[in-house]
UniProtKB/Swiss-Prot annotation:
GO terms for molecular function: frizzled binding; identical protein binding; protein domain specific binding; protein kinase binding; protein-macromolecule adaptor activity; small GTPase binding. It is found in: Cell membrane; Cytoplasm, Cytosol; Cytoplasmic vesicle; Nucleus. GO terms for cellular component: aggresome; apical part of cell; clathrin-coated endocytic vesicle; cytoplasm; cytoplasmic vesicle; cytosol; lateral plasma membrane; nuclear body. This is Segment polarity protein dishevelled homolog DVL-2. InterPro entries: DEP_dom, Dishevelled_C-dom, Dishevelled_fam, Dishevelled_protein_dom, DIX, DIX_dom_sf, Dsh/Dvl-rel, DVL2. It comes from Homo sapiens.
Length: 736
């Protein structure tokens, strides 16, 4: 086999590059004839080949596209294709078998004995090697009967072994066919042949070239009247016959390679009378070698394709009705598909199934991640490695990935997520980008809260990702503990957990134990009957509340060696001497707010902290008591209900913390004076301006201003704010 290419040299000169037989090195000659007037006789006069040589030239056919045309008339002009003339020369130096008539004559004689082949498993089939999509002629009865169950490497080796025999005994000058039965290559490639087409080794040898130009374009002989299945077959065999480096290069031209796409062809007939639309989006693939086919991008619910169920995202669209997409550009294919859909009647879609028809079964996409049409295999492998829910028992490597670069102590890392894991590690895992918790900007009262999440989402995440919760209510208590520990924060410092409120992550840079110093899981978590009691942590520099008595005390100064300043709820626990309060049973009528008859706590109203620990007695001072190292928040009610005199100083439940912070001395109200109860007022009880120096104000507190100097309209605004905070769930509306 030989090939030649001519290009304009000088004026009136044509360069001829030809390949002789199977030689890899081309030859170059110059013919002093313009390219538009060069004839076969001019070509022969320069080459001076024997008379038995056959010449094939590349030309364009209206029905088949690029073909190889045999020219035997010396006066015939050589076809010009894209400004060049391409030719293949088959020499008659080798012994040639008896000449056979053209292909279309023996087709009728040889077709009946060829029985249809049994179907082969799709997973053993070969892949698509060219950048153009595969297609099959409508006359081919079953397209996946034409596939050969052998690997690509085996095919290359076997074809290379048979090349000398084919050159010695099976090739002839005209590219015709043997009359003594199929050659060994025919038997070797019989799986590709159907009863309506006949491909012999001799013709195959004329279309199998090792040149780079053949690597770029497919060439076929116009005398064979091949179907599109045979053209796909020829392209496929030519790819497998190439040398291994070229196989590797060819596989990189298209993202749809043998490992990602198999020739499992299905034909789906859709009855468009029952449905209003087809219901698919298509994606075109292109590369440096041209358009690479049309693929199913997504399937819409309610359409004809979704109702059928066999076509899935990632499938390659080969043919619609009788319109084949083999030699169409992507734009033409889209236009043809649009025209067919607008016409009445059923629609027949022929698609090549994806290597894995359901890649979405391997992973779950996050709710906000866009879906883009990509290679299905790369989609599966990449997403399976990077996407998915957080495992229930992550290994050490997974946990180290989540906490990588964090400032947590060594004791906080490498543990499984369970109820025994420290809360800081659980919160770090929950704050990871792929944890599954939906964290995004939220809108509340026309205010944007960045990186916020819903309380119910936190409870659900804890219940599904942290081991050890027998029921969801326990996960809710755990979430309340996260709020009290400062690992998650409410936007307005609300310390009672609610599933309808928005929260943000707190400071996760401290050590694990630093968050748990003041935490007690027995506190009111919002899941009991007091869940509707929305109490607020003290705001920095709270202004005085009107008409309340003032007492001589001061805020405790932060310890100079403390790793972090005490949180505001810890500061508020010293408001009345660490938790002393008068009995509310006898003095409840003096409350300006809602009256509590159960001896509630002064700040948070936790029922667990209402147990009487102070000793009642006139003028007696109770002994300090400790409760697990947690500070008493607000005032503790005395255990008496007979209206006896209140204790002069309540029990300070924060004795351990007082030892940890020397210099923090509680100061109580004057003995014998009952305090009017109101949860909000008790929390907001201010220090009088004279005895409070600026150095001992809470960190970050603004200048203290007496509310008496504030205009009445501003006072009403502050009261409205507290009323709104008393019913926060009515204002938290997610409008995103």
């Amino acid at each position: 086999m030989a090939g030649s290419s001519t290009g304009g040299g000088g004026v009136g000169e044509t360069k001829v590059i030809y390949h002789l037989d199977e030689e890899e090195t081309p030859y170059l000659v110059k013919i002093p004839v313009p390219a538009e007037r060069i004839t076969l006789g001019d070509f022969k006069s320069v080459l001076q080949r024997p008379a038995g040589a056959k010449y094939f030239f590349k030309s364009m056919d209206q029905d088949f596209g690029v073909v190889k045309e045999e020219i035997s008339d010396d006066n015939a002009r050589l076809p010009c294709f894209n400004g060049r003339v391409v030719s293949w020369l088959v020499s008659s130096d080798n012994p040639q078998p008896e000449m056979a008539p053209p292909v279309h004559e023996p087709r009728a004689e040889l077709a009946p004995p060829a029985p249809p082949l049994p179907p082969l498993p799709p997973e053993r089939t070969s892949g698509i090697g060219d950048s153009r999509p595969p297609s099959f002629h409508p006359n081919v009865s079953s397209s996946h009967e034409n596939l050969e169950p052998e690997t690509e490497t085996e095919s290359v080796v076997s074809l290379r072994r048979e090349r000398p025999r084919r050159r010695d005994s099976s090739e002839h000058g005209a590219g015709g066919h043997r009359t003594g039965g199929p050659s060994r290559l025919e038997r070797h490639l019989a799986g590709y042949e159907s009863s309506s087409t006949l491909m012999t080794s001799e013709l195959e040898s004329t279309s199998l070239g090792d040149s780079d130009e053949e690597d770029t374009m497919s060439r076929f002989s116009s005398s064979t009247e091949q179907s599109s299945a045979s053209r796909l077959l020829k392209r496929h065999r030519r790819r497998r016959k190439q040398r291994p480096p070229r196989l590797e290069r060819t596989s990189s031209f298209s993202s749809v390679t043998d490992s990602t796409m198999s020739l499992n062809i299905i034909t789906v007939t859709l009855n468009m009378e029952k449905y209003n639309f087809l219901g698919i989006s298509i994606v075109g693939q292109s590369n440096e070698r041209g358009d690479g086919g049309i693929y199913i991008g997504s399937i819409m619910k309610g359409g004809a394709v979704a109702a059928d169920g066999r076509i899935e995202p990632g499938d390659m669209l080969l043919q619609v009705n009788d319109m084949n997409f083999e030699n169409m550009s992507n734009d033409d294919a889209v236009r043809v598909l649009r025209d067919i859909v607008h016409k009445p009647g059923p629609i027949v879609l022929t698609v090549a199934k994806c290597w894995d028809p359901s890649p979405q079964a391997y992973f779950t996409l996050p709710r906000n991640e866009p879906i883009q049409p990509i290679d299905p295999a790369a989609w599966v492998s990449h997403s399976a490695a990077l996407t998915g829910t957080f495992p229930a028992y992550p290994g050490s490597s997974s946990m180290s990935t989540i906490t990588s670069g964090s400032s947590l102590p060594d004791g906080c890392e490498g543990r499984g997520l369970s109820v025994h894991t420290d809360m800081a590690s659980v919160t770090k895992a929950m704050a990871a980008p792929e944890s599954g918790l939906e964290v995004r900007d939220r809108m509340w009262l026309k205010i944007t809260i960045p990186n916020a999440f819903l309380g119910s989402d936190v409870v659900d995440w804890l219940y599904h990702h942290v081991e050890g919760f027998p029921e969801r209510r326990e996960a809710r208590k755990y979430a309340s503990g996260l709020l009290k520990a400062g690992l998650i924060r409410h936007t307005v410092n609300k310390i009672t957990f609610s599933e309808q409120c928005y929260y943000v992550f707190g400071d996760l840079s401290g050590g694990c134990e630093s968050y748990l110093v003041n935490l007690s899981l027995n506190d009111n978590d919002g899941s009991s009957g007091a869940s509707d009691q929305d109490t607020l942590a003290p705001l920095p520099g709270a202004t005085p509340w009107p008409l309340l008595p003032t007492f001589s005390y001061q805020y405790p100064a932060p310890h100079p060696y403390s790793p972090q300043p005490p949180p505001y709820h810890e500061l508020s626990s010293y408001t009345y001497g660490g938790g002393s309060a008068s009995s509310q049973h006898s003095e409840g009528s003096r409350s300006s707010g809602s009256t509590r008859s159960d001896g509630g706590a002064g700040r948070t109203g936790r029922p667990e902290e209402r147990a009487p620990e102070s000793k009642s007695g006139s003028g007696s001072e109770s002994e300090p008591s400790s409760r697990g190292g947690s500070l008493r928040r607000g005032g503790e009610a005395s255990g008496t209900s007979d209206g006896g005199p209140p204790p002069s100083r309540g029990s300070t439940g924060g004795a351990p913390n007082l030892r940890a912070h020397p210099g923090l001395h509680p100061y109580g109200p004057p003995p014998g004076m009952a305090l009017p109860y109101n949860p909000m007022m008790v929390v907001m009880m201010p220090p009088p301006p004279p005895p409070v120096p600026p150095a001992v104000q809470p960190p970050g507190a603004p200048p203290v201003r007496d509310l008496g100097s504030v205009p009445p309209e501003l006072t009403a605004s502050r009261q409205s704010f507290h009323m709104a905070m008393g019913n926060p769930s009515e204002f938290f509306v997610d409008v995103m």
